[in-house]
Amino acid sequence: MLRRTSILASIIALAAVLRLWGIGSAPPALQYDEAVNGLTAAGILAGEHPGLLMQKDGREPIHFYLVAASIAVLGKTPGALRLPYVLASIGLVAAVWLLARELFGRKVGWLATLLCAGTLWPVYLGRYGTRSVFFALVTALALFSAARAWRSRAIGWWVVTGLLFGVSYYTYPVNLFVLPAIVLVLAGAALRRSEALRENGRGIAVMIAVTALLALPMWLYRGASLTQSFSRPQHLAVFYAGQGPVDFVKTLAAQTVLVLRMFFLRGDANPLHNIPGRPVFDAAMALPFLLGLAALAQMRYRRRGLVIAAWAALFLLPTFLSKSAPHFLRAVGILPVLFLFPALGLLHTHRWLRQTTNRAVANMVVGGLMAVSVFVTARDFLLRDFLNSPYVYRAYNGEETSLALQINRRLGIGWTGSNLVTRPGPVRDSMHIWVDPDVWDGNPYAQFLVPGPLDEFPGLHTLSSGAELTASAGVLFVHPQNVAAWLEHIPAGKTARVQPGPWLHDPDTKATQRLYHIVSW
């Protein structure tokens, strides 16, 4: 028992290291969605309560409250904002262990868990502060609970399953596929006239009732806010009304290739989701994945295999049906079952090698494949410092976030570039900063990361027509078009120094301009 616990603890520790490394400083910026999430969470701490769907694209609420709890303890830093998502990603590793062990035993459980701990997709998913990872965690736990309930026939486990599936409707929009997935699995069991289905009939009814009861407020809210709920899916859809048959077939073929090749050839190209173009699995896991897929077709695994394959196929639909395929966030629903495939392949490889050679060779080959896969992830993600690369910095809106860093470093408080916990005051008495509304108002990054709003925080002021600049040292953050006007207001006898701010390229207008200038004296 102690040995088994130690193995699992070691895998969880590996997952934690890969996900928590440099959390306070890498990347040294906030992406727009992260900043908006942070502002919403800060609003909760101020007494505001978001609805069931927030923002124009309809964001579910659970993660806002988790982020609020984190920043209440650690302060408003990127690391504090991302910590709940990192913990959810680590929790996903444990949930995969529970599910894999329940379905296929302890050995597959360890293998699947190690793969989840060391594969780039779930590692990076936790470092990007958006809500998709919570769906993967909750549904992995729900599938484990369902498997335990099916085996034990215990009503209590069916209730837990219903609660978890219900909670999934408050996590991420791919939850719209949860009910179809349940129906598909039950329909398959009914077609096979499973005795276990009849024995679990009452429990399944309880699960569905609990799921529906918990999800009902979200369903009603979505029904009353159809434009908010479905405008983005309609915008992203690759199939549309009036599409010609030739175009439909071409799109169908293209999407199929794009989605299927993500596993071994070319994955998500977005640096917010992935090392651009990197497939889900490296070369070391390609053959084990295919062997595991074949193993699930064997008679001894067939029922479980059909459930796993049906779940995976259904939750590939969100990326298959939308633009920018493959999209790792939209495909997040497959993560609970994804690592079962290579884990089974590795198990069968080990058994075959043990029978044809000996245990030492089997251990060396399977262990070597696992070690190579984990090393490749650590090398590409950590050793090559992916999160601090220039294109990742740009993808995370590093230029816009720099305003917050410039302000906080001058005030000597808050997040100053590498700290997980916000630096406390007091503010330097001699420091006064004025920020141009043309710079501040469109910058949610600074609005979240700077410890307080303009004119309400010591030393931080709005640069408006009535502003009185102090005769002592001061700093202005001015929109480039307003610099000349404000240079005339510098206190007499002071020499103004103008430092150009970062460049920002607007892909829509193709224009490049300075975000702000720093005027100091």
Please describe what each predicted stretch is.
Residues 65, 221, 444-445, 485-486:
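Phosphate- and divalent-cation-binding pockets in alpha/beta enzyme and binding domains
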Residues 104, 435-437, 478-479:
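Short beta-strand/turn micro-motifs composed of small residues
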Residues 354-358:
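Membrane interface segments of multi-pass transport proteins and intramembrane proteases
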Residues 2-243, 247, 251-353:
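Membrane-integral, polyisoprenol-dependent glycosyltransferases
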Residues 171, 183-186, 218, 268, ...:
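N-terminal secretory/membrane-targeting helices
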Residues 456-521:
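Aromatic/acidic, Gly/Pro-rich catalytic loop(s) in extracytoplasmic/lumenal soluble domains
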Residues 101, 106, 447-452, 491-495:
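Short, solvent-exposed amphipathic alpha-helical segments in soluble enzyme
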Residues 26, 279, 359-462, 507-512:
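Membrane-proximal, lumen/periplasm-facing interface regions of secretory-pathway glyco-
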